[in-house]
Design a protein with these regions (language model features):
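Conserved beta-strand hairpin/beta-sheet module of binuclear metal-dependent hydrolase folds
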Residues: 10-65, 172-184, 189
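Active-site metal-binding motif and surrounding structural segment of the metallo-beta-lactamase
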Residues: 54-100, 104
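Metallo-beta-lactamase
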Residues: 2-5, 10-11, 104-161
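Core dinuclear metal-dependent hydrolase active-site scaffold
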Residues: 33, 149-175
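Short, intrinsically disordered, charge-balanced linker/junction segments flanking boundaries
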Residues: 146, 192-196
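Short catalytic-loop micro-motif centered on adjacent basic/acidic residues
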Residues: 44-47, 73-76, 160-162
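Active-site metal-binding loops of divalent metal-dependent hydrolases
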Residues: 48-50, 79, 102-104, 166-167, ...
Length: 196
């Protein structure tokens, strides 16, 4: 069984999980490309990586789907800096819809910053989190709120599961027919102290 690395050992390392699911490590985060390059040049991007990673993501898309690759939409698991870092640059190249849970809307429209982290949570990642950027961005002109049904626009066969805790509107993506789960950062919701 192929697994996406918990943290990126080598930034820029791509792993084909399935013919239509490819994950790319971008420093401490992962982005996923959904689409089978043997059948189409179109793809959906899950998350938008770290700041200054747009070039890497665009280059990987071209390598996988061809120079004329076409991004259909971006689905965000949540709006933390390591999942939206290249979002605005990607939208300059591809003016596409961005889908997120309604509870992430304030952080993606510039209305609110994420609250400060809880200092009482143990673990190295939790202790480092006050150093992470918490500021919001404004992509309101591209932002679309996911429907409450759990269905994912432009991704037939996939659904989203609201997995709050890491952020209020955190989602994970699931495809029933092959039991694929893209967890986002949901793994940090339980026993975070065991993470480092």
């Amino acid at each position: 069984m192929k697994k996406i690395p918990l943290t990126s050992v080598t930034s820029g390392l791509g792993i084909e999980i399935l013919p239509d699911l490819y994950c790319l490590s971008v420093q401490i985060a992962n982005v996923c490309f959904i689409g089978d390059p043997r059948q189409t040049n179109e793809f959906i991007l899950i998350d938008a990586g770290m700041p200054d990673s747009a070039g890497l993501i665009i280059e990987e898309a071209k390598n996988r789907f061809g120079e004329d690759c076409k991004l259909i939409s971006i689905i965000l698991t949540h709006g933390h800096f390591d999942h939206i870092g290249a979002l605005q640059e990607l939208l300059e190249k591809w003016n596409v819809p961005v889908y997120a849970h309604s509870l992430e809307e304030p952080y993606l429209t510039g209305k609110e910053n994420y609250p400060p982290p809880n200092k009482d949570i143990p673990g190295l990642v939790a202790k480092m989190s006050p150093l992470f950027p918490r500021h919001s961005i404004d992509v309101s002109s591209n932002l679309h709120i996911l429907p409450p049904s759990g269905k994912l626009p432009s991704l037939p066969g996939w659904e989203y599961i609201h997995t709050p805790g890491h952020t209020p509107g955190h989602i994970s993506l699931f495809r029933e027919n092959d039991r694929v789960l893209i967890a986002g950062d949901a793994f940090t919701n339980v026993e975070q102290e065991s993470l480092y």
